[in-house]
Amino acid sequence: MAARAQAWLFAAALVIFHGSEYVLAAAFHGRRNVTATSLLISKQYVLAMSFAMLEHLTEALLFPELKEYWFVSYVGLVMVIIGEVIRKLAVVTAGRSFTHVIRIHYEDQHKLITHGVYRLMRHPGYSGFLIWAVGTQVMLCNPLSTVAFTLVLWRFFSKRIPYEEFFLRQFFGREYEEYAQKVHSGLPFIE
């Protein structure tokens, strides 16, 4: 797979991921409740993706042989697809209970979701995003960004999950405790 094809697949993955996040947020929460932040694009995210493209372009120009490992690119593409599917299954399964912002106050529509993909992991949205994001870098054959994305995202989720679960335990009590004991978080080394 040529460097140009890798870059086009990367662009397509970004458009599909963010476009579908926005569409699903609008479908479950109404268009009035959806803002540009529903696209999940922050300054840090733009910086990370810009670094990834800079790495890809620099390596394609200076070390083009790094971009010729087609089997690595295909593994990355499979990761992108798997991550996207897991993430979207999480969103669709949770429906209105899935939000991009951690809720710190209980609301009547809150439900503990333990069926579907949530039977397999407590945080399929995070797991899917991690697989998707790292997959984009594997697909680009970006060694630096692959390692950086893995470490930064793991660190981010290792802090976000306990914070979110503090509130889930407040909202759902014993029911959440039992669920958490039976079902893994979905991310390695994060209980």
From Swiss-Prot:
Record GO biological process: methylation
Reaction equation(s) it catalyzes: [protein]-C-terminal S-[(2E,6E)-farnesyl]-L-cysteine + S-adenosyl-L-methionine = [protein]-C-terminal S-[(2E,6E)-farnesyl]-L-cysteine methyl ester + S-adenosyl-L-homocysteine
Subcellular location: Endoplasmic reticulum membrane
Pfam families given in the database record: ICMT (PF04140)
Keywords: Endoplasmic reticulum, Membrane, Methyltransferase, S-adenosyl-L-methionine, Transferase, Transmembrane, Transmembrane helix
Binding site for S-adenosyl-L-methionine: H110, K111, L112, I113, Y118, H123, P124, G125, Y126, E164
UniProt: substrate binding residues: R160
Gene Ontology molecular function, alphabetical: protein C-terminal S-isoprenylcysteine carboxyl O-methyltransferase activity
Transmembrane regions: 8-28, 45-65, 66-86, 129-149
Cellular component aspect of the GO annotation: endoplasmic reticulum; endoplasmic reticulum membrane
Domain of life of the organism encoding this protein: Eukaryota
Disulfide cross-links: none
Cofactor or coenzyme needed: Zn(2+)
EC top class, as a word: transferase
Entry-linked InterPro entries: ICMT_MeTrfase, PPMT_MeTrfase
Endoplasmic reticulum found in the keyword field: yes
Gene3D superfamilies xrefs: 1.20.120.1630
EC number(s) given by UniProt: 2.1.1.100
Free-text remark on how the cofactor is bound: Divalent metal cations. Probably Zn(2+).
Function description: Catalyzes the post-translational methylation of isoprenylated C-terminal cysteine residues. Carboxyl methylation is a reversible and potentially regulated step in the post-translational modification of prenylated proteins.
PANTHER family, alphabetized: PROTEIN-S ISOPRENYLCYSTEINE O-METHYLTRANSFERASE (PTHR12714), PROTEIN-S-ISOPRENYLCYSTEINE O-METHYLTRANSFERASE (PTHR12714:SF9)
Name used for this protein in its record: Probable protein-S-isoprenylcysteine O-methyltransferase
Lineage: Eukaryota, Viridiplantae, Streptophyta, Embryophyta, Tracheophyta
Gene name as annotated: ICMT
